[in-house]
């Protein structure tokens, strides 16, 4: 109320010039809705469309509509360093392609089936795939993943479950997506630091129990536990790599 809108724009112009940028925006907390809608507000400029180059992978998004999860950078790089040559992958929570694109570009996955419900994220993923020239190796399954994953039962060598705070609701579907010979699961969870060891055991036992119930009993083993970041005081974002044979 102390300055006019014109004066405010002049201030943003000065700041933009000092930073050598063309646009400015304000980042508020990510919405808590199912879509995790972006709360970015443009201060200078009208378009929120950006391209991000991370670890040799190009991402596209409109920052006013979807978020870019910068805190998971180490995990994106780790996944991108895994050799997935010849593998069929199901990404149960694809978003804008945080892990889908590294798996296609860096890991050399043969094909990724990406499940996503948010139209804005799907647009971003499609554009990102084109930027990386991998659109022919990507199939987007739009809608609720508990339904769309049924389209790829018994096809996958690997299933990625990258959602927080818990991916538990998709564990059964993920097992069903694995080939009859088995495969690997990447399970993201938020866990209290002092309970990580117990939770890893619980997770492994639960996957083994579900596999048996589904008539897919086999050898279930934990291959790796990655501590990605602190999510909150005492709460870790972890990824459990599980092999099902």
Regions found by a protein language model. Give the residues of each.
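SAM-dependent transferase fold signal centered on methyltransferase-like domains
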Residues: 1-245
